[in-house]
Amino acid sequence: MLGHIKLMTVAPEIEAIRKVVALHEPNILVVDTTDEVHVDRFDGEIQRQNMVIGALKEMAQKHNIIVFAVHHVNKVSAAGNTISLHSLKGSTNIVQKADKVLMVKGKRDERARIICSEKSRDEGRFEMTCAFDFETMTFKELL
């Protein structure tokens, strides 16, 4: 049913992601999580993040695709369900480099989620409440 979706189930090198994008020419690339992408020769976490995000942005521009780079929130914010841009695990470096930041808020054991735009260079912010359907892999807006 979801044959149009291709999955890599191992933490890839950034070069492996480049090859997959060139081979399959996707419209959308989801990297979950940016922490798991391996890069060569880096000095510290900020430089590693710069290399990963820089490579993903380059692929987006070169191949005219949408890239979703997943970055998790810290445990304290997740446990208290008080998620904001300051809740991101580690450095806010990723937020600074992103064109848009979407946050998915909600409790792990509930189907309803709030999807909100926390940062956007081109458009205004939005927020909507959705339910996720695991069979169709889609969100349905709850009014």
What does each of the following model-derived ranges do?
Residues 1-44, 51, 108-109:
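Conserved inter-motif catalytic segment of the P-loop NTP-binding fold
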Residues 43-45, 84-85:
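Short glycine-enriched, charge-decorated loop/helix-capping segments at active-site entrances
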Residues 54-143:
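Phosphate-binding/switch region of NTP-binding enzymes
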